[in-house]
Regions:
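N-terminal amphipathic alpha-helix/helix-capping segment at the start of soluble metabolic enzymes
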Residues: 1-19, 129-140
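Hydrophobic faces of well-ordered beta-strands that scaffold small-molecule active sites
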Residues: 14-20, 39-41, 67-71, 90-92, ...
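Short, acidic/polar
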Residues: 20-34, 73-81, 151-163
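Glycine-rich, proline-tolerant flexible connector loops at the mouths of alpha/beta enzymes
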Residues: 27-54
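Short, ordered loop/turn segments at secondary-structure junctions
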Residues: 43-46, 72-73, 95-97
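Alpha-helix-loop-beta-strand connector modules within alpha/beta enzyme cores
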Residues: 50-84, 108-114, 136-140
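Conserved anion-binding
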Residues: 77, 89-164
Length: 165
């Protein structure tokens, strides 16, 4: 799923997705059946908890749709948990400066690209059946979407765009 999504973007193709604010996995199955490429599971404004998100991610995988979790704020635990439960990417809103972007990357990626906390007994590591190097490589390739908001972000756009990752 992730490679196909990235390939489409690299080839200049459009990808189509839907924001979901419900906790019912059925909606994600229907979206997948309908032919969309991805779904953004909104934990910033939606009523779901981490367990609901994990079930929503399973529904996305079942129907071949890329699950991206929109996390509510920049925090190492929030970002790590979203990725640990199997999200193939994260979206972060309220980005205002390059330092915000650097924090997101640091929290989302494992060493040497970041400082994400390690636990291999999670869904994303196939409950430790993936070896450590394969797990780190897979996780460091996941999608990070930043959402710039406010005048400060626009004023800092050039420095934000210079951040690698």
């Amino acid at each position: 799923m992730l490679n196909e999504f990235k390939s489409k973007l690299e080839n200049g193709e459009f990808v189509y997705g839907v924001f979901v604010k419900t906790s019912d996995p059925m909606f994600n199955e229907i979206i997948g059946i309908s032919g969309y490429d991805y779904v953004i599971l909104d934990t910033e404004h939606g009523p779901t908890d981490i367990e609901n998100q994990q079930n929503n991610i399973r529904a996305c995988e079942l129907r071949g749709i890329l699950p991206i979790v929109r996390v509510p704020y920049i925090d190492d635990n929030v970002i790590g948990k979203a990725l640990d439960i199997g999200a193939m990417g994260i979206q972060i809103s309220q980005i205002r400066c390059a330092e915000d972007v650097k924090k997101v990357i640091k929290y989302a990626k494992f060493y040497p690209e970041g400082e994400r906390g390690v636990c291999r007994f999670v869904r994303a590591a196939d409950y430790s059946s993936l070896n450590r190097n394969a797990f780190f490589k897979k996780e460091n390739e996941k999608i990070i979407i930043i959402q710039l908001e406010g005048k400060e972000a626009i004023d800092n756009l050039d420095e934000i765009l210079e951040v690698d990752g």
